[in-house]
């Protein structure tokens, strides 16, 4: 009986060992499945965070580009404002300059009138010098090809002495401030 008892105990121990082994395997499999689930959840979180990071980086790049464009635009506007700061004053002075030129076209009959015209010419010259220092220059018109950016045609005539589309007379001087036309020349153009 002692052998039978030992055998029964061995069988029971073997069965218990098998049950324990199966329980350990089940627990290990559950733990593995749980770990795999956690890994999957963590990978999903990583993917979401990476997507969010990419989105924020793109937004940052757009904001930086917008800011650079703003700085460039502001700089260009400041440069233009500095370059053309005197445009309003020049525009207001041009009619007075036109009047000087009209007055200087008068024929001087007496010494007093000649003296007055010389004084007016000196004032006109000083005024023109000051304007030129600011970058104002008269637009060349007579003999030039008509350019709608520089000239305003107020009359058209036919004259065989001039080519087609050539300015033959300037009725009012035009002026540029640096590279910007502030007043186009009023001209007579040959057809």
UniProtKB/Swiss-Prot annotation:
PROSITE patterns: GRPE. Keywords: Chaperone, Cytoplasm, Stress response. It is found in: Cytoplasm. Residues 1-49 are annotated as: Disordered. Residues 30-49 have a biased composition (Basic and acidic residues). Its main location: cytoplasm. Belongs to the GrpE family. Homodimer. Participates actively in the response to hyperosmotic and heat shock by preventing the aggregation of stress-denatured proteins, in association with DnaK and GrpE. It is the nucleotide exchange factor for DnaK and may function as a thermosensor. Unfolded proteins bind initially to DnaJ; upon interaction with the DnaJ-bound protein, DnaK hydrolyzes its bound ATP, resulting in the formation of a stable complex. GrpE releases ADP from DnaK; ATP binding to DnaK triggers the release of the substrate protein, thus completing the reaction cycle. This is Protein GrpE. The gene is grpE.
